[in-house]
Amino acid sequence: MAAQKIRIRLKAFDYRLIDQSALEIVETAKRTGAVVKGPVPLPTRIERFDILRSPHVNKTSRDQFEIRTHQRLMDIVDPTDKTVDALMKLDLPAGVDVEIKL
């Protein structure tokens, strides 16, 4: 039978939060005896918005805003029951989106 693995994908607007969360997940998994591959930084998604400064005229005058979405990917190979329980109880910051696939 193939080795079981857990794939964790993290998304956040702040790279410091995502790196801190990735470090907590890696430490928790290693403490319970699982092998961790990653965190692998995935490409940052940049969404840009152009807004007219004036409500009436001056089409050439615009403000530009952007949202950067940072992503990290990690695999936990051969997780034990203790690993899964520890990951479920882990308290991560509010700005981090966690996606777990078994």
Swiss-Prot record:
Gene3D superfamilies: Ribosomal protein S10 domain (3.30.70.600)
GO molecular function, one term: tRNA binding
One Pfam family, short name: Ribosomal_S10
Name under which the protein is recorded: Small ribosomal subunit protein uS10
SMART domains: Ribosomal_S10 (SM01403)
GO biological process per UniProt: translation
Family, as annotated: Belongs to the universal ribosomal protein uS10 family.
PANTHER family recorded: 30S RIBOSOMAL PROTEIN S10 FAMILY MEMBER
Organism in which the protein naturally occurs: Methylobacillus flagellatus (strain ATCC 51484 / DSM 6875 / VKM B-1610 / KT)
Protein keywords: Ribonucleoprotein, Ribosomal protein
Transmembrane stretches, start-end: none
Assembly notes: Part of the 30S ribosomal subunit.
